[in-house]
Amino acid sequence: EKTFLTVSGQLEGEIYAMALSEVYTFGPTFRAENSNTSRHLAEFWMVEPEMAFYDLDDNMDLAEKFIQYLVSQVMENCADDMAFFNQRIDTTLLETLRNIVDNQFERLTYTEAIHQLQKSTKVFNYPVEWGFALQAEHERYLSEEVFKKPIIVFNYPEQIKSFYMKLNECGETVRAMDVLLPNLGEIIGGSQREENYEVLIKRMQDKELNPEEYSWYLDLRKFGSAP
């Protein structure tokens, strides 16, 4: 029997969320990516919360509070280390961390982000066009040069996102969000889940997935569900 390295515990986490309302997983994650960059890892540990009856706004609120809590704890409990890094590695580190903790994250739709990029005079290596994923240079431009603080981009085109993400009424976007930090880029990705059984099956078929292979997941929607 074939076995695979896990990329996420999310789908399984949804099972427990149906019973316990608020749960999280913390475990190893493997990605078939080139890890010879400052932004990619082939293996890392990831926290994945799953909450029943959370909409996209609730997800964005949780993501913002989570990042701010973690950064504040690092600044409080690892002050000497942060001071060392600020002195020897990046003299703007402490300023960047305070900016994360002290400011409300900017929120804008994917469409608004595309408009911001298209009206910019900056020349990007990758073209800016609605329907394509934002590249690292786009994300950093928005967080570092336009807003100069953490941002949350939401309502992405459905064709570039996963089948389980809640489809908006327009039918063109899904209730997904990414948290982008200055000097780093994307640090959190999340979404409101699609709770409609028929819509979920169609989304699977549109992405050429076999619903029978996800029968256990579809049962969560067939016999009562929550977003």
Predicted regions and their residues:
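A translation/RNA-centric and nucleic-acid-associated enzymatic feature enriched
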Residues: 2-69, 83-227
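Metal-dependent enolase-superfamily TIM-barrel catalytic cores that perform enediolate-based chemistry
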Residues: 71-75
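Residue-level recognition of alpha-helix termini/interfacial anchor residues
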Residues: 77-81
